[in-house]
């Protein structure tokens, strides 16, 4: 395992934030009918992958990708709830708990 440095964690956090922004812009784009939001979504995805590429210089790829994806899903779910009134059903909540448990297990491995 690589030695932990805060700069790589910061890059990972930035990648997560950009992924959430990309997903919100994608929703606002309404299937790319609102092109500016669609283009902003693409730019945010490119930025997220660029930030992730910096994060994996100091964080194992498997850990960084799992955390990026997992936190991105959980935070996008929260954004969907706050911004769009989207709610999870019982199965969705179970899936979210399993996702979070999996992220913890990967980090502890």
Curated annotation (Swiss-Prot):
BP term (GO), one: glycine betaine transport
The highest taxon in the source lineage is Bacteria
Q: Name one GO molecular function term.
A: spermidine transmembrane transporter activity
Q: Where in the cell is it found?
A: Cell inner membrane
Q: Which keywords does this chain's UniProt record carry?
A: Cell inner membrane, Cell membrane, Membrane, Transmembrane, Transmembrane helix, Transport
SUPFAM superfamilies from the entry? Answer: Multidrug resistance efflux transporter EmrE (SSF103481)
List all membrane-crossing ranges: 6-26, 36-56, 64-84, 88-108
Q: Which Pfam families match?
A: Multi_Drug_Res
- Tell me how this protein sits in the membrane: Multi-pass membrane protein
Q: Mention any one GO cellular component term assigned to this protein in its UniProt record.
A: plasma membrane
What NCBIfam families would the database entry show?
PRK10650.1
Q: How does it assemble?
A: Forms a complex with MdtJ.
Hey, which family's this protein in? Belongs to the drug/metabolite transporter (DMT) superfamily. Small multidrug resistance (SMR) (TC 2.A.7.1) family. MdtI subfamily.
Family matches, as HAMAP family: MdtI
Functional description taken from the UniProt entry: Catalyzes the excretion of spermidine.
Q: Protein name, please?
A: Spermidine export protein MdtI
């Amino acid at each position: 395992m690589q030695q932990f440095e805060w700069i790589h964690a910061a890059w990972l956090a930035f990648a997560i934030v950009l992924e959430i922004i990309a997903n919100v812009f994608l929703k606002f784009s309404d299937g790319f009918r609102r092109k500016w939001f669609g283009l902003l979504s693409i730019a945010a995805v490119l930025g997220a992958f660029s930030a992730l590429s910096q994060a994996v210089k100091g964080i194992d790829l498997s850990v960084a990708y799992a955390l990026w994806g997992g936190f991105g899903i959980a935070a996008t779910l929260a954004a969907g709830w706050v911004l769009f009134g989207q709610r999870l059903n019982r199965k969705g909540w179970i899936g979210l708990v399993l996702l979070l448990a999996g992220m913890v297990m990967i980090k502890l491995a």
